[in-house]
Amino acid sequence: VFEHGTLDVEVYAPRGRDPQTPHTRDEVYVVMTGTGTFVNGDVRFRFGPGDVLFVPAGVEHRFEDFSDDFVTWVVFYGPEGGEAATDRSA
């Protein structure tokens, strides 16, 4: 939907199951509609409209048991390896 420098904004609306694999950059989800369970590493929690979810680069994550109307913005940003990789080299 939108790209500028290291910023990439998309709409994500999986149906049935969420086939995601870890990404190379940090990401933020902003839930627009729907509910479900978000798995972020070893943590599982319920989400709903308006929730903001952060996933560091390289972390296993997925949406489970989500409603048919689930839609979220996903924002990828920063360097490959995530901001934490940059912080380690400073």
Regions found by a protein language model. Give the residues of each.
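Short histidine-centered beta-strand/loop micro-motifs
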Residues: 1, 17-23, 40, 45, ...
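Histidine-centered metal-chelating micro-motifs
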Residues: 17-18, 53, 57-62
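Short, conserved beta-strand element in jelly-roll/cupin
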Residues: 23-38
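Short acidic-glycine-tyrosine-enriched beta hairpin
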Residues: 42-57
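Short hydrophobic/aromatic-rich beta-strand segments that constitute the beta-sheet cores
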Residues: 9-10, 38, 72
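A short glycine-rich, His/Asp/Glu-containing loop-to-beta-strand
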Residues: 1-20, 25-26, 77
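Ligand-binding loop in jelly-roll beta-barrel domains
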Residues: 58-83
